[in-house]
Regions:
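Gly/Ala-rich phosphate-binding loop of Rossmann-like dinucleotide-binding domains
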Residues: 34, 38, 116
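Rossmann-like adenosine-cofactor binding region
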Residues: 50-137
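C-terminal helix-to-coil terminal segments
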Residues: 12, 131-173
Length: 173
């Protein structure tokens, strides 16, 4: 945005190498995330109650054991039940990053706001929300990136989803 406005402001970032990345939900998308992260020499932590197949270089932990170790938490779980609320945010180390590309209701929004204001979470990216379109208070936080539920919004993904739907219909008959 700044460069579009003619400003050349450099902000220092955070390197992935050496960080612990927690993937909550280790289905198809969670596994792809793990594969993409491996070249960055990160420690991969996974929380998934229904894990079907282990992957080399991945540590499978309970959420209570994984959260205190994670520098970055990325959520790709299915379901509708809240996963991260007040008690889970208390376990997270100060200065962590949080990404949610799963379901909005998996994170308690009030607890996330408290974590942002306290510095527990220093950056968040949210692509899903409990109520959409989203008009809530997270819009005012500069350290939060909000996208309008576009994680699967590509031509290729939509075609794949359509083909899968057709296959499911055909296999039912």
């Amino acid at each position: 945005k700044e460069m579009h406005n003619g400003k050349w402001t450099k902000k220092i970032g955070v390197q992935l190498e050496g960080k612990a990345v927690l993937i909550i939900g280790f289905g198809r998308i969670g596994r792809k995330v793990a594969e993409l992260l491996k070249p960055f020499n990160v420690r991969l932590l996974v929380v998934d109650q229904d894990i079907q197949e282990k992957m080399k270089g991945v540590e499978i932990l309970s959420i209570n054991n994984a959260l205190p170790q994670a520098d970055i938490i990325t959520i790709h779980a299915s379901g509708e039940q809240q996963i991260i609320g007040d008690s889970e945010f208390k376990l997270i180390k100060d200065g962590a990053f949080l990404l949610n590309a799963a379901r909005g209701q998996l994170i308690n929004e009030d607890a996330l706001i408290n974590a942002l204001e306290s510095g527990k979470i220093v950056g968040a990216w949210l692509d899903t929300f409990g109520v959409e379109p989203y008009t809530g208070p997270l819009r005012k936080y500069s350290q939060v990136i909000l996208t309008p539920h576009v994680g699967s919004y590509t031509v290729e993904c939509r075609k794949s989803m359509e083909m899968e739907a057709v296959d499911n219909l055909l296999s039912a008959f």
